[in-house]
Amino acid sequence: MQEMVGYLIKYPNVLREVMEGNACLLGVDKDQSECIINGFKGLEIYSMLDWKY
């Protein structure tokens, strides 16, 4: 799962699509996918995916 999180950080456009429900994470089950998405939502990411400090 750590590799998937790293990939989503590297490619924020993919993260955006996954969070909007327009894409899914291959090889990741629904529970893991929801966990990853909720983790990013918990970081208070702006709509342009700039990190909020």
From Swiss-Prot:
It comes from the Bacteria. Keywords: Competence, Lipoprotein, Pheromone, Prenylation, Secreted. The keyword Cytoplasm does not apply. Its main location: secreted. Coiled coil: none annotated. One of its GO terms (biological process) is establishment of competence for transformation. Residues 1-46 form a propeptide. It is found in: Secreted. GO terms for cellular component: extracellular region. Signal peptide: none annotated. Interacts directly with the sensor histidine kinase ComP and stimulates its activity. The DNA sequences encoding ComQ, ComX and the N-terminal two-thirds of ComP show a striking polymorphism, which determines the specificity of the quorum-sensing system in the different pherotypes of Bacillus. In ComX, the sole conserved residue is the modified tryptophan essential for the activity. This is ComX pheromone. It comes from Bacillus mojavensis. The lineage of its organism: Bacteria, Bacillati, Bacillota, Bacilli, Bacillales.
